[in-house]
UniProtKB/Swiss-Prot annotation:
Keywords: Glycoprotein, Host Golgi apparatus, Host membrane, Membrane, Transmembrane, Transmembrane helix, Viral envelope protein, Viral matrix protein, Virion
Biological role: Component of the viral envelope that plays a central role in virus morphogenesis and assembly via its interactions with other viral proteins.
Family membership: Belongs to the gammacoronaviruses M protein family.
Entry-linked Pfam families: CoV_M
Gene: M
Residue stretches spanning the membrane: 21-41, 52-72, 78-98
Keyword set includes Transmembrane helix: yes
Top-level taxon in the UniProt lineage: Viruses
Protein's recorded name: Membrane protein
Length: 225
């Protein structure tokens, strides 16, 4: 009869294991803390990209752990709970991809796969350049600014442009809607009277439809040309 080996760690073994790997655990937890706390699109793009990768990895990791829990359940009750949690994780992960793909089809921006938000802002400059940015929700007003020849919106660096490059309408897309914002006010110039150095634009929400950005044309050309 083969010998059965108990792979369960006792308290002393767990303490010893923690002592051996405590430096690695500390460094790993500090890394996650920095990534999750300071990873914003308005700050460091590198840290924000790492944060997105970490968030993308969480769902597959949860599903993998759930499958292991279903394979090696502690008891019948644990098996039922593991199945429920694993199914929930799978449905949530599939739902994320469905919504992201729908949003990508509407605005053609890789920001669609941002796990932090379900909306993407888009500004088509009159020089033909398209600027997309992450946005957490659909606001009533958007206020892009130009500072020293650089366009910002929602605190994010978008492109180098002049005040005359801003269009009459800008958009915020969600998986099922396209929100259209119309320019209602424009302020140009700083204290020195330099109109190219600083400008503020106010866009108010005008209408909502189910169109895609590629249906918008400026000067007879498609948004993607």
């Amino acid at each position: 009869m083969p010998n059965e080996t108990n792979c369960t760690l006792d308290f002393e073994q767990s303490v010893q294991l923690f002592k051996e790997y405590n430096l690695f655990i500390t460094a790993f937890l500090l890394f996650l803390t920095i990534i999750l706390q300071y990873g914003y699109a308005t700050r460091t793009k590198v840290i924000y990209t790492l944060k997105m990768i970490v968030l993308w990895c969480f769902w597959p990791l949860n599903i993998a752990v759930g499958v292991i829990s279903c394979t090696y359940p502690p008891n019948t009750g644990g098996l039922v709970v593991a199945i429920i949690l694993t199914v929930f994780a799978c449905l949530s992960f599939v739902g994320y991809w469905i919504q992201s793909i729908r949003l990508f089809k509407r605005c053609r921006s890789w920001w669609s796969f941002n796990p932090e938000s379900n909306a993407v802002g888009s500004i088509l400059l009159t020089n033909g350049q398209q600027c997309n940015f992450a946005i957490e929700s659909v606001p009533m007003v958007l206020s892009p600014i130009i500072k020293n020849g650089v366009l910002y919106c929602e605190g994010q660096w978008l492109a180098k442009c002049e005040p005359d490059h801003l269009p009459k309408d800008i958009f915020v897309c969600t998986p099922d809607r396209r929100n259209i914002y119309r320019m209602v006010q424009k302020y140009t110039g700083d204290q020195s009277g330099n109109k190219k150095r600083f400008a503020t634009f106010v866009y108010a929400k005008q209408s909502v439809d189910t169109g895609e950005l590629e249906s918008v044309a400026t000067g007879g050309s498609s948004l993607y040309t």
